[in-house]
């Protein structure tokens, strides 16, 4: 990836984006072509958080991924890394997903 700061960390302050970009390591292309054999989403309820400001995976692709997994969909206006830019919101979404799963409501 040529610019993680612009693609993955686009909603962080420039100094924070540069820090996280410096920690990036190469990812094998095999993740794009290896057939998945036991996706957890087939056995347990899943939630997909569509990040509307994601520069790495546009929302229309995220919607396709969520649909393929029959996931419950939540949305936020975040870049690709809400765990860094919107931690409070993300924690809330995780708590809601856990509560749905515990209550037994299948998304």
PLM-predicted stretches and their roles:
Residues 74-92, 105-107:
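Catalytic histidine-centered segment of alpha/beta-hydrolase-like enzymes
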Residues 42, 47-50:
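Short beta-strand/loop motif that positions the catalytic acidic residue
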Residues 13-15:
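PEST-like low-complexity, intrinsically disordered acidic/proline/serine-rich tracts
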Residues 52-77, 84, 96-98:
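Conserved loop-alpha-helix segment in the C-terminal half of the alpha/beta-hydrolase fold
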């Amino acid at each position: 990836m040529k610019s993680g700061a612009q693609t993955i960390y686009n909603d962080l302050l420039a100094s924070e984006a540069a820090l996280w970009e410096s920690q990036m390591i190469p990812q094998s292309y095999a993740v794009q072509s290896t057939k998945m054999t036991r996706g957890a989403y087939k056995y347990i309820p899943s939630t997909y958080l569509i990040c509307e400001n994601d520069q790495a995976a546009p929302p229309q692709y995220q919607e396709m991924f969520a649909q393929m997994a029959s996931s419950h969909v939540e949305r936020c206006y975040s870049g690709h890394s809400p765990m860094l830019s919107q931690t409070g919101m993300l924690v809330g979404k995780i708590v809601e997903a856990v509560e749905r799963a515990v209550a037994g409501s299948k998304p």
